[in-house]
Amino acid sequence: MITQEEKLAALGKTCLTLKQEKKLAQAVALIDSELPTEALTSLAMLKKAEFLHDVNETERAYALYETLIAQNNDEARYEYARRLYNTGLAKDAQLILKKVSNGVQKKYNNYLGKINKICDLLERLEGKAIPVGTNTCIIAMKHAILFYRNRQPRQLPVGSFGRLALCTGSLGSGGAERQISRLAIEIARKYRQKGKIGGLKVEEPVELIIRSLTPELRQDFFLKEVLEEQVEVLEIAKITGNLFDDATIESPELRLLLSHLPPVCKYGIKHLVPHLCERKLDYLSVWQDSACLMIALAALIAGVPRIQLGLRGLPPVVRKRLFKPEYEPLYQALAVVPGVDFMSNNHCVTRHYADWLKLEAKHFQVVYNGVLPPSTEPSSEVPHKIWQQFTQKTQDADTTIGGVFRFVGDKNPFAWIDFAARYLQHHPATRFVLVGDGDLRAEAQKRAEQLGILERILFVGASRDVGYWLQKMNVFILFSRYEGLPNVLIEAQMVGVPVISTPAGGSAECFIEGVSGFILDDAQTVNLDQACRYAEKLVNLWRSRTGICQQTQSFLQERFTVEHMVGTFVKTIASQPR
């Protein structure tokens, strides 16, 4: 006969399998079916709490632990304390475990001692008591970084450009991924050619360190391109050997701090420190907040002398869906470490980060994107046929207004549909072209149909022929709520199309106001009347010109060429921060 313990063990294995298969809802349903709360022994309730916690049903698990603790179940105290500690609630765990019965306290003394050590250390470093409910993993991360506040980075190469690694989360199809790939390719070419960048001879290969390149998640969009250019690529997710051993850390205090970090920091340290030590990097440039959280402390432990933190969009305190409580203490601590500074691709983002983190402007540098003029030749006959069919349906149109964006909330696609409807009221001889795909595309098309303008809008979908579609437009419009530095505004001008944009991110830095485009008043609520007025002006401006004006051409050449981007990047990272 199968015992209760054996049944519970089998259920635990099944739940683990379902979790690995990402079938969490199915796992929860199974747990509730097999272990109905009203008929549980103490052992079964304890195991149910464990299983629920393991499938991310944290609140329900904690409620069960508290029910058992109310019944003076010391094993529940221990299990609850252990899980609280591992999630960063060391003070909560300490309070719970201190209350175990005197008769069994010895059983849990080692674990309580471990909790007491980290709490005592953190309170000493903070100079104050830490209240219950505080995430102690974040405090430990902060002080692990501050351990290096008096470090003396080794001297950087003089007269040559040393060994560089560029790090980010993936090589998907995003703008940051395009820029980091382009940068790696250009430096790799100079290395093969034994050339110079900004007067510095490139004597070392460049490496891309990427968290994950899973094809099924489309995280490898630029991988083929960088490999063809002989860029070395390391995928962190595939590192299985030569992992970090904290026994190599001499300071007992630092070792204790490293034992109580946020999981993503632990992951970066475990997988990357040995590799970074082996590579003996001179410079490390880490792009995007999530990668900075994973890699920055690992780089300090490995002794990388020059660390640059790449900020590609507005801070997570503005883009709430990207917010993590680790970011603010992470960046504020890193800002005081010698050899570390911040880099962005526009001044708007640096101002927002500086205001949020209460840091001086000297901590930030700007490297504008390097943008290649888009090809206006289609990659196949398909775009041309689509365009011909659309022009046949809209033969009365003498003006084409368009946009290129993902159909997601941040890009505000419904404002685009509303603009088209408003503009058509006074300019019926207008057609519209929208390039891009996303979760809200079908809803945007439905909105256009409801407004009676679906026949006037060509929804191209995702396309590699962006240049072809841009050169069909008389005016380009971007209604984004949030941006970093939108390359598409630059690309539109490169093919001679004037632009209108919200002031999202660095959009206003992409063109000359009143010459090659206009900025709207507000990024969150689009002023459609203002957008219509600007569109009228630019349509007339476009008709009076033949191509891009010299002033705009010079502006784009001086700010957004790939050569300028690479040169500025090397200049910023090849010297120690001020």
UniProtKB/Swiss-Prot annotation:
Q: Which Pfam families match?
A: Glycos_transf_1
The pathway entry for this protein reads as: Glycan metabolism; Vi-antigen biosynthesis; Capsule biogenesis; capsule polysaccharide biosynthesis
Domain of life, source organism: Bacteria
The terms under GO molecular function for this entry are: glycosyltransferase activity
Tell me the Gene Ontology biological-process terms attached to this UniProt entry: capsule polysaccharide biosynthetic process; carbohydrate derivative metabolic process
Q: From the Swiss-Prot or TrEMBL record, give the protein name.
A: Vi polysaccharide biosynthesis protein VipC/TviE
Instruction: Name the source organism.
Output: Salmonella typhi
